[in-house]
């Protein structure tokens, strides 16, 4: 099986007089994370909770962060609140044998304290689709679900390749993705959302921004003439989104009523549901071509 960034060597240790294989992978900070048999896993980021579920490891999870809300079964687990507010002591009190965290969503000082206490910590920061798949593979290795989840991960990645093959060669459609309205925020070219737009044959009008997210101006959006306006949210959010931009009827996207929302979380949360979001984005961009 193709494994990304997994260490080729298997470390052998001794437990109760028997040899036990310890799986080692590198996390997204290039730190080596080794575990023998994960049984008490703390997951402190929503995208990681969804990935653990996708690879079949939820039976080993003892608690999650407060924002994890998918799958529905996660709501039966203890929720620890905002990881930024958690100290190492409160995490250690749960007696985890593996902690999964988002680099942008936790203090790295806390991570260092956990590692000093002997707890393996996997730090995640996927920015591209392939990196999400890599995270799936590495976590499945740590959780002991590698064999039964391998084909599912391959199929997930293949669906993106199929979308690119179907839409990638079509006429390019300029797209503005809105993260927030006040202040007006968007995502740059380093985020997976930009990659999704591109594989659908679109172009993020702020692909040139070096940061993952940035504040922009209405004038800047108008100048780049998007043909699709895109955001994440509910039906109620969609109506607000449409009304927000109705004051600029000269914008191609507004003039042609190409203003869309995708359901909350699935596009900006770099996890398994990203493929469902990508299919919606491709359909919206295709509609703008007609």
Model regions and ranges:
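Bacterial Sec-exported substrate-binding components of ABC uptake systems
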Residues: 2-49, 145-176, 283-290
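A short, structured surface patch at a secondary-structure boundary
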Residues: 40-94, 98-103, 205
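Short secondary-structure boundary segments
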Residues: 45, 103-104, 179, 209, ...
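His/Asp/Glu-enriched short active-site or ligand-binding loop at hydrolase and phosphoryl-transfer sites
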Residues: 65, 190-213, 233, 261
């Amino acid at each position: 099986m193709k494994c990304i960034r997994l260490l080729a060597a298997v470390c052998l240790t001794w437990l109760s007089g028997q040899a036990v294989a310890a799986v080692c992978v590198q996390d997204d900070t290039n730190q080596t994370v080794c575990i023998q048999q994960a049984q008490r896993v703390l997951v402190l980021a929503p995208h990681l909770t969804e990935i653990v579920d996708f690879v079949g490891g939820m039976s080993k999870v003892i608690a999650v962060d407060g924002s994890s809300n998918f799958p529905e079964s996660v709501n039966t687990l203890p929720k620890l609140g905002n990881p930024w507010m958690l100290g190492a002591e409160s995490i250690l009190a749960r007696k985890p044998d593996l902690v999964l965290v988002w680099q942008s969503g936790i203090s790295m000082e806390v991570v260092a304290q956990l590692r000093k206490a002997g707890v393996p910590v996997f730090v995640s920061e996927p920015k591209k689709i392939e990196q999400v798949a890599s995270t799936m593979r590495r976590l499945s290795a740590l959780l002991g679900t590698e064999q039964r989840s391998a084909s599912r991960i391959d199929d997930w990645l293949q669906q993106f390749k199929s979308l690119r093959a179907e839409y990638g060669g079509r006429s390019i459609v300029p797209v503005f993705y809105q993260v927030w309205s006040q202040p007006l925020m968007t995502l740059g070219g380093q985020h997976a959302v930009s990659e999704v737009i591109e594989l659908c044959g679109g172009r993020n009008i702020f692909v040139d921004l070096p940061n993952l997210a940035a504040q922009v101006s209405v004038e800047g959006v108008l100048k780049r003439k998007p043909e699709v306006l895109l955001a994440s949210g509910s039906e109620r959010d969609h109506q607000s989104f449409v009304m927000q931009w109705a004051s600029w009827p000269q914008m191609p996207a507004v003039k042609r009523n190409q203003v869309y929302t995708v359901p909350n979380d699935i596009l900006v949360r770099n996890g398994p549901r990203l493929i469902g979001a990508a299919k919606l984005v491709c359909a919206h961009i295709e509609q703008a071509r007609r």
